[in-house]
């Protein structure tokens, strides 16, 4: 029996509708709108595409949205000055620096310079620490999207065996921290696999919920999945192009095999990806309320 598709695009649309109502209420009752600035250094085509998608969503929701494009040779100190300006701007509640940055700029130094209360990506060590102790102001966007997708699909997370393949600071580590907390949509037992894990399949076959963020196309095969498991495929890998030049994308899970074993699975594209930008918008609305002391 083919698995149910967990279509993040549809869930993200529902959440955006909720956020739009919230933004309208912020404006009508309190006279404020969420403000988001996206800083793009250079002309990386993929980064330009991501920034465009974020800006389009922000406009759709009625945000005060600023796109600050800077040349690839921008000096690091100039970028720090820009961030300082937005840190002090009361109309801006969220600051997003699009990564990767040019090699001459120290990414860690840049991310550390963002006011943690405006760090809507939740990358700042202050926000990572708050997540660790279970008191986050903002949740990292892709893990938050995964958790929201699990909750809204009715997946039983509490008490579940969850295996995460990948230990990145953006997905693997934070989703492990989130799902182990004493909280709704959490209370799971977590295993994290990585490049030094021996016999990854022995861990993935135990998982009631399998989250794969390995960065390798079709790394997890159907025979590595527990029958009836819920599979969250975070990977987006370009494996070629069609005759008319369109990208061919594959996830980190061999979809055609997995769909015959799992009870539910996210497609690629259209699964986790759309949730990430939507959760960024949710964090920005939250930041607006925090800065304006709105409960």
Curated annotation (Swiss-Prot):
GO biological process, one term: methionine biosynthetic process
Pathway: One-carbon metabolism; tetrahydrofolate interconversion
Chain sites annotated for binding NADP(+): 166-168, 195, 236
Keyword Plastid set for record: no
Reported function: Catalyzes the oxidation of 5,10-methylenetetrahydrofolate to 5,10-methenyltetrahydrofolate and then the hydrolysis of 5,10-methenyltetrahydrofolate to 10-formyltetrahydrofolate.
GO CC, one annotated term: cytosol
This protein's name: Bifunctional protein FolD
Molecular function terms, GO-annotated: methenyltetrahydrofolate cyclohydrolase activity; methylenetetrahydrofolate dehydrogenase (NADP+) activity
Subunit structure: Homodimer.
Gene: folD
Catalyses which reaction(s): (6R)-5,10-methylene-5,6,7,8-tetrahydrofolate + NADP(+) = (6R)-5,10-methenyltetrahydrofolate + NADPH; (6R)-5,10-methenyltetrahydrofolate + H2O = (6R)-10-formyltetrahydrofolate + H(+)
Family: Belongs to the tetrahydrofolate dehydrogenase/cyclohydrolase family.
Enzyme nomenclature, EC number: 1.5.1.5, 3.5.4.9
Transmembrane segments: none
Keyword terms: Amino-acid biosynthesis, Histidine biosynthesis, Hydrolase, Methionine biosynthesis, Multifunctional enzyme, NADP, One-carbon metabolism, Oxidoreductase, Purine biosynthesis
Pfam families: THF_DHG_CYH, THF_DHG_CYH_C
